[in-house]
Regions:
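Short hydrophobic/aromatic beta-strand micro-patches
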Residues: 43-45
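Catalytic core of pol beta-like nucleotidyltransferases
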Residues: 1-22, 30-36, 47-96
Length: 96
């Protein structure tokens, strides 16, 4: 099973590749209770140089690198008034 540091390094590499500003890792890997079956949950803060269509390529690349299923979203896709938004900001681990 990949360590949290290995996952964070893979995300950093992909943030640079796709010109995104930062990301939040959330879910079981952020909480430290991931199992071998856990997926990766990532919110991307794209910024002005990030093409929103690249979120799919970033997720595919992360899945290929880690061998994990990946749920990735660009922050603009998340309703800021939702419980989901609050949850990712409360438990998320920032990666830049």
């Amino acid at each position: 099973m990949l360590t949290k540091d290995e996952i964070e390094n893979a995300i950093r590499f992909l943030l640079r590749k796709y010109h995104a500003e930062s990301a939040l890792l959330f879910g079981s890997y952020a909480r430290g209770d991931a199992t071998p079956e856990s997926d990766l949950d990532v919110i991307v803060f794209g910024g002005k140089h990030f093409k929103k269509t690249n979120i799919f390529a970033l997720a595919e690349d992360l899945q290929e690198i880690t061998g994990k299923n990946v749920d990735a979203f660009e922050i603009s896709e998340v309703d800021p008034n939702s419980a989901f938004y609050d949850s990712i900001h409360r438990e998320g681990v920032k990666i830049a």
